[in-house]
A protein has these predicted regions:
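Right-hand nucleic-acid polymerase module
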Residues: 67-68, 122-123, 139-235
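Conserved polymerase palm-domain catalytic core
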Residues: 5-108, 112-129, 137-141, 147, ...
Length: 235
């Protein structure tokens, strides 16, 4: 699930931006630090109580979350992923409705805003930082930054750039494969230590494979599938 002004793809959003402003302007890239580990339960429960009116469902959800301890959500579970997408929902509305930023996208802990004014993005970052502090969401200072849009937009391990005619050029599949191969080896260790089970790992890997379908990456996927099978299937 990705959050945008009207749920379009990044490529179409950048194309619209280019038609309006060309390749000038800036991108504010926002990254939450150790997002799953730091989700604050009290804030999450307050948001859930505003949305879930069924008391039984709300109680079950709270019980599930509390199983992870006083703070954070576990990796692998689909419920955790849904809650992780939901948690910054108020920030999404603030950016789109209060700051009136049209060119905005988010998935989990990665988000970006495109704007032709650097000053507007600087002011937006100040306001977003205050809201994150309120909900105890930590911004990653190294990855949260404002850069010229002509250098590209980094989102979900991809880089989107404008071609000479405004065509959107998408790259980054090879780097994503390298990261995923490292993750699979860590997942194997977590499996051995009982922190993850095979079903959770399969769901995480399936989600990543779905994302990789956007790339011309059949050969890379075959190699990664081979590693996955070696670590989790062929035993």
């Amino acid at each position: 699930m990705s959050v945008r002004a009207d749920q379009r793809s990044e490529s179409s959003l950048l194309s619209e931006y280019y038609r309006k402003y060309g390749a000038s302007g800036y991108v504010l890239t926002i990254d939450f630090s150790k997002y799953f580990d730091n989700i604050e339960h009290e804030s999450l429960f307050q948001m859930l109580s505003e949305q879930i009116k069924d008391k039984t469902l709300l109680a079950l959800t709270k019980y599930y979350v509390q199983e992870f301890g006083p703070v954070g959500l576990g990796l692998g579970s689909q419920v955790s992923q849904i809650l992780a997408v939901f948690f910054p929902n108020k920030i999404d509305h603030f950016i789109k409705e209060k700051l009136r930023m049209r060119f905005y996208g988010r998935y989990m802990d990665d988000s970006y805003i495109l704007c032709n004014s650097k000053e507007e993005l600087q002011n937006a970052l100040k306001e977003i930082s205050k809201l994150c502090e309120k909900y105890k969401i930590r911004l990653n200072p190294k990855k949260t930054r404002i850069t010229p849009i002509k250098h590209g937009v980094d989102f979900l391990h991809c880089r989107y750039k404008f071609g000479r005619t405004g065509k959107i050029i998408k790259s980054g599949g090879r780097e994503s494969v390298k990261r995923e191969r490292r993750k699979l080896k860590k997942f194997r260790k977590k499996l051995d230590e009982g922190e993850l089970d095979r079903k959770q790992i399969a769901e995480l890997y399936s989600s990543w494979r779905g994302f990789m379908q956007y790339f011309d990456s059949k050969t890379l996927l075959k190699k990664t599938d081979k590693l996955y099978n070696k670590l989790f299937i062929e035993e």
